[in-house]
Structures are given as structure tokens and as C-alpha cells.
């Protein structure tokens, strides 16, 4: 009987914290939130991702920055980027992002140099004989034009 009481007590003791934490789980958990880091930490995390990109594939990234796009080939395909520009204008960092085929350029994109927020999953693609990493967008918003 004493063993049963101990087992019941431990079960309740272990389950209560787990049940209590369930309400803290967010629908869109972000693994790396660049929008909430200092510039030093942004640079460090960005370098870690570039150096070990395979470790970050499938991770959710949130990033605020400047929107930039340009035509990448003669077919007229456009690449879209979110760029972080440090205060001293040195060492700009950013990622290409893709919103999906339902979004048409330029109608569904902001003007060049608009401040944007991108949240999505890190992925990779091969183009022009090289492998590139990009953010597969789940959420996109314009902070300011």
C-alpha cells in the first residue's frame, strides 16, 4: 500500500508541472528570433547559421530588416531578401526568402528598402550550380514603407 501511495504521489507530482506548462506553448514557436537580439548576437547567430547550415534546416526563424529584391536571370525571376543593416553600415546580413507561388511581384511585395518582418522555416535550394539557404515564409508583414 505504501508503494502504491508513493507511485500515486510521484505521478501527480510529475504531471502537474507538465499540465501547467501546456498553456505556454505557442502556435508558431520561433527557434531563432533575430528581431529580439542585440547586433552582436545577430552577427554571431548569423555566422553560426552560415557555418553550420545543415544544423539549422527546418528551424523557424524570425527576422526584421530591409526588403530588397532584384532580377536573377533573363527569364525575369526575382529574388527577395530581408537584410539587416548594422548602425555603422558594415557587414550587412540577410537571407533570401520565398513566399510561395500565390504571391506575385511587384503587386504582393513592398517597395524597395521597406522595413519588413519575415517568419519562416530555413530551407535550401540549388541554383546556378550552388546551394543557397532561404527562409520559406509562414508569416510576412510590412513594418513601414
Which role does the model predict for each range below?
Residues 1-5:
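Positively charged n-region of N-terminal signal peptides that target proteins for export
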Residues 8-17:
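Bacterial N-terminal signal peptides
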Residues 6, 19-145:
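OB-fold and OB-like single-stranded nucleic-acid-recognition modules
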Amino acid at each position: 500500500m505504501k508503494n502504491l501511495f508513493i507511485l500515486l504521489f510521484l505521478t501527480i507530482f510529475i504531471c502537474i508541472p507538465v499540465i501547467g506548462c501546456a498553456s505556454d506553448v505557442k502556435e508558431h514557436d520561433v527557434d531563432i528570433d533575430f528581431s529580439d537580439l542585440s547586433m552582436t548576437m545577430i552577427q554571431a547567430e548569423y555566422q553560426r547559421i552560415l557555418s553550420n547550415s545543415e544544423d539549422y534546416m527546418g528551424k523557424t526563424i524570425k527576422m526584421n530588416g530591409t526588403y530588397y529584391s532584384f532580377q536573377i536571370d533573363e527569364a525575369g525571376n526575382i529574388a527577395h531578401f530581408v537584410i539587416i543593416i548594422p548602425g555603422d553600415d558594415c557587414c550587412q546580413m540577410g537571407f533570401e526568402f520565398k513566399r510561395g507561388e500565390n504571391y506575385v511581384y511587384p503587386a504582393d511585395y513592398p517597395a524597395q528598402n521597406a522595413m519588413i518582418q519575415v517568419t519562416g522555416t530555413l530551407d535550401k535550394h540549388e541554383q546556378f550550380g550552388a546551394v543557397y539557404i532561404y527562409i520559406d515564409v509562414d508569416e510576412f508583414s510590412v513594418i513601414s514603407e
